[in-house]
């Protein structure tokens, strides 16, 4: 799956070899108008290719999310990007040969055919069921064969496709002059991308993987709110032909907290602060701190899950789902994820004024965790219909109170410090008494025999030293039972849908971070290099990977492994 990600912090697109096959508008979690990635025949696409070609080379411009596609050693060169602040696609071209353009938008995930209107300078594609539409402005020596096919002669020019909720304010309206000139938009985006990454810490190893992962994290931040989505796609299957197809275009408290840690460690503190503020504003002091595991990009509750039965699915993997029913789950680990991210931000900035201003959130979470940690819940892996006393969930309750106690101590709240520290110790004792099998190794849930990869986070969150015998035994079992290829691991053996098959890429970065703590640096580097080799040509990592082909599986690219890559690389620098 060698798709390139294009993003401007408003929406995203996925492109492969000149064909844009995913484009939700106007924002990350909106219905798509190009959906070919989920249905070869009915999905819709925006294709630019020469009449004939033998080879295609794709690469990003520097560490931006601007894509350069070259056909046959320069016969046709495309520069594709989403301009800042607009739900639009700009495609600059330089051609030595004539080429073809095919534009086939279908509104509402391929369900609604577009009405068309040909203009002197381009084409309008209207949604007959609303005021929205797309407008294609064409620059160069071209001929419109039909509303869906254009031929362009050699030379330089561009194609500018803009989405409008109301076509009265689009490119061809009297207000069209306000939209960016394409070449200027390119320069602005490249300058902006450079400036963002210039602020980041410079790593001593794996520079390409580091900056590409950072650019992906930044590309998944919804700029109007600061929320960070887990992935730009829906229903890319974990296993081809299976039903493990989910919509990840939402802001998971857990995933975004992990990304905040990566941003903090990378010194991109403004983005980290905005993402923290987004999560803080979702807190409910009167109930469970986060009443949903994830939210829409504007902070509203996510939509209910539904199947799009008219789409055949990625490689015929049905169903295609939008929305996500996991939003109804009670997940008791997420408060700890947030608290750890907040604490990491504080450690980096020592900004007591900021922590004081949101200490109500620290208290609300600590009170809720203190009164609720003994209950059962769904775990980090979001198994449907199953609640247990998961060891990782208890760990994150410990993390919440441990970090809260440290913040309270630094702010001079000594009584709260003692109270929360005592409760954290109580949880720790409970885990050591109930989350361990035969005094030998940790288990996935109390009273069970299974292990899972989330147990790798025990030393990462400083619950227990990586050298502790209990953990070393656990590490050995994970390596023996969950490893399916060199450096690649399942997150668990089975779930409510059956046996797991494809490795979960985040686990490789967890493993690397564990071996860094064990000072086995060669092993840690080998693990990261294994994942880097599977990163596709463009350096993007999916949620899963096929252990035989190294091809990405699951939603793509995914926030978790890119955050883990950044954290792993920077932790190398801290111990060297």
UniProtKB/Swiss-Prot annotation:
Catalytic activity as recorded in UniProt: alpha,alpha-trehalose + H2O = alpha-D-glucose + beta-D-glucose
Noted pH dependence of activity: Optimum pH is 3.7. More than half of the maximal activity is observed over a range between pH 3.5 and 4.5.
Pathway: Glycan degradation; trehalose degradation; D-glucose from alpha,alpha-trehalose: step 1/1
Keyword Hydrolase tagged: yes
Thermal activity profile: Optimum temperature is 70 degrees Celsius.
Entry-linked Pfam families: Glyco_hydro_15, TREH_N
Gene Ontology terms describing biological process: trehalose catabolic process
Keywords: Carbohydrate metabolism, Glycosidase, Hydrolase
Alphabetized NCBIfam families for the sequence: trehalase_H1_Arch, trehalase_H2_Arch
Family from the record: Belongs to the glycosyl hydrolase 15 family.
Job of this protein: Catalyzes the hydrolysis of alpha,alpha-trehalose into two molecules of D-glucose.
The protein's name: Trehalase 2
């Amino acid at each position: 799956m060698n798709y390139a990600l294009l993003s401007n912090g408003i929406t995203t697109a996925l492109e492969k070899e000149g064909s844009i096959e995913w484009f939700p508008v106007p924002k990350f979690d909106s219905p798509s108008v190009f959906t070919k990635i989920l249905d070869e025949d009915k999905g819709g696409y925006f294709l630019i290719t020469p009449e004939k070609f033998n080879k295609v080379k794709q690469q990003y411009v520097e560490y931006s999310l601007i894509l350069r596609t070259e056909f046959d050693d320069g016969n046709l060169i495309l520069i594709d990007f989403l301009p800042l602040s607009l739900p639009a696609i700009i495609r600059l071209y330089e051609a030595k040969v004539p080429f073809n353009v095919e534009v086939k938008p279908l509104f509402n995930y391929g369900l609604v055919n577009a009405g068309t209107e040909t203009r002197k300078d381009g084409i309008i594609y209207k949604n007959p069921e609303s005021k929205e539409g797309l407008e294609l402005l064409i620059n160069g020596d071209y001929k419109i064969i039909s509303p869906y096919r254009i031929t362009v002669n050699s030379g330089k020019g561009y194609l500018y496709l803009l989405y409008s909720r109301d076509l009265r304010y689009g490119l061809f309206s009297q207000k069209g002059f306000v939209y960016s000139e394409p070449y200027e938009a390119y320069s602005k985006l490249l300058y902006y991308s450079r400036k963002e990454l210039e602020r980041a810490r410079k790593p001593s190893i794996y520079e390409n993987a580091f900056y590409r992962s950072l650019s992906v994290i930044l590309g998944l931040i919804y700029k109007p709110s600061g929320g960070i989505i887990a992935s730009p796609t829906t229903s890319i299957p974990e296993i081809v032909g299976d039903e493990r197809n989910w919509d990840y275009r939402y802001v998971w408290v857990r995933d975004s907290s992990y990304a905040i840690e990566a941003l903090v460690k990378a010194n991109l503190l403004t983005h980290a602060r905005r993402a923290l503020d987004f999560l803080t504003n979702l807190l409910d002091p009167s109930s469970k701190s986060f009443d949903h595991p994830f939210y829409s990009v504007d902070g509203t509750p996510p939509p209910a899950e539904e199947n799009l039965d008219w789409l055949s699915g990625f490689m015929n993997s049905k169903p295609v789902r939008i929305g996500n029913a996991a939003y109804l789950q009670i997940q008791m680990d997420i408060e700890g994820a947030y608290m750890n991210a907040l604490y990491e931000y504080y450690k980096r900035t020592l900004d007591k004024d900021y922590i004081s201003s949101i200490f109500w959130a620290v208290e609300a979470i600590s009170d809720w965790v203190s009164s609720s940690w003994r209950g059962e819940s769904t775990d980090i892996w979001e198994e449907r219909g199953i609640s247990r006393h998961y060891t990782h969930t208890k760990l994150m309750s410990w993390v919440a109170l441990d970090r809260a106690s440290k913040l309270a101590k630094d702010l001079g709240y000594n009584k709260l410090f003692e109270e929360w520290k005592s409760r954290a110790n109580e949880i720790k004792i409970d885990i050591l008494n109930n989350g361990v099998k035969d005094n030998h190794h940790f288990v996935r849930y109390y009273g069970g025999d299974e292990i899972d990869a989330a147990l790798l986070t025990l030393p990462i969150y400083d619950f227990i030293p990586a050298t502790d015998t209990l953990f070393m035994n656990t590490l050995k079992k994970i390596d023996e039972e969950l490893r399916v290829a060199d450096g690649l691991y399942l997150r668990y053996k089975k779930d409510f849908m059956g046996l797991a098959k494809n490795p979960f890429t985040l686990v490789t970065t967890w493993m690397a971070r564990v071996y860094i703590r064990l000072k086995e640096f060669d092993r840690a580097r080998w693990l990261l290099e294994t994942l880097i080799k599977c990163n596709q040509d463009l350096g993007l990592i999916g949620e899963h990977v096929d252990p035989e082909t190294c091809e990405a599986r699951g939603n793509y690219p995914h926030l978790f492994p890119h955050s883990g890559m950044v954290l792993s690389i920077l932790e190398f620098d801290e111990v060297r």
